[in-house]
Amino acid sequence: MRKNEMSTSKQAIQWKCLESKIESKRLHYGRFLVSPFKRGQASTVGIAMRRALLQEIEGTSITCARFCGVVHEYSTITGLQETIHDVLVNLKEIVLRGDSKEDIQEAFLSVTGPKEVTAGDLSLPPGVEAIDNSQYIATITQPISLTIELEIEKDCGYRIENLAKSGKGQFPIDAVFMPVRNVNYSIHLFGSGRATQEILFIEIWTNGSLTPHEALRKASEKLMDLLTTFLYVRGGDVSLFENGEDSLDLTKSPSLQPQFGDTNNLEERVLENRFIDQLELPARAFNCLKRAEIYTIADLLNYSREDLSKLKNFGRKSVDQVSEALWDRFAKELPDKKIVLNRRK
């Protein structure tokens, strides 16, 4: 391999946002470039990213509505222009952004007509907001009161509700938990000969509850969490079960032992490749750690709480934030005393 080909193959893969625009409150667009890849790598990444963007990112949606005195979804209410079915369809399309970790949250709609009812009239729980307050729900043509109790959930993908759960004015709603509306990717070659490499272009359209940049980040985190699982597999954990018989330890087979290798330090190697930006710390704490040359989770675990509190401009609050994020993200705790694993030189 020629010298210029060798240097090209060792270039770090980088990404760049080529275009970002808000076409409407409920339609955001972003186009990204990722390169350089070796031949065949771009399609692997493109396929995985597209599926993760469309299927793995959580969204918030209305999943159930309760009306007082309504028998079935095709009922009508005097003074309400739409049928109950039409109102349910409009509620399904309301775009919400939610940060709560609760399974089910309660919301309600209580208005008096005559009035055009929109998403801005919803009374939503803390941490949940409507992206477009002008989204249409119904029109009240007479001076009547309309009250609807709602359930809001956070999930992935598309959920078809069981209509058997309907009754007594309660109507499950088919929910779309997909912040990403569409994803396209394309691959282009550059270079020549053995130095030929690939550029991956990714286009993302979202419903406004996430920006394309946020969606790309979340999809990347989902893929990393999924694949990191394999790095934690130890030889002694691999077994085969068949027909309820005793497990067969594959690592005892001489022919298979080379496939497992030395797995004792896998966890340490994983942490060396997980960077502190994955803790999503406040800017103050993050910048203080970087100034102290703490770049990875492995670096961070070399410091006790007392050690961190001695860093410049790093107070008790910052230490608590780091400790909480470390536990939430990696189920790790700061050591009681300073230890040295693999400090960067």
UniProtKB/Swiss-Prot annotation:
InterPro entries documented for this protein: DNA-dir_RNA_pol_insert (IPR011262), DNA-dir_RNA_pol_RpoA/D/Rpb3 (IPR011263), DNA-dir_RpoA (IPR011773), RBP11-like (IPR036603), RNAP_asu_C (IPR011260), RNApol_insert_sf (IPR036643)
One cellular component (GO) term of this entry: mitochondrion
Keyword set includes Oxidoreductase: no
Keyword Transcription: yes
Matches recorded under CDD domains: RNAP_alpha_NTD
Cellular compartment(s): Plastid, Chloroplast
Chain residue ranges for the region called Alpha C-terminal domain (alpha-CTD): 266-345
EC supergroup of this enzyme: transferase
NCBIfam families given in the database record: rpoA
Entry's family note: Belongs to the RNA polymerase alpha chain family.
Name of this chain's protein: DNA-directed RNA polymerase subunit alpha
Gene this protein is translated from: rpoA
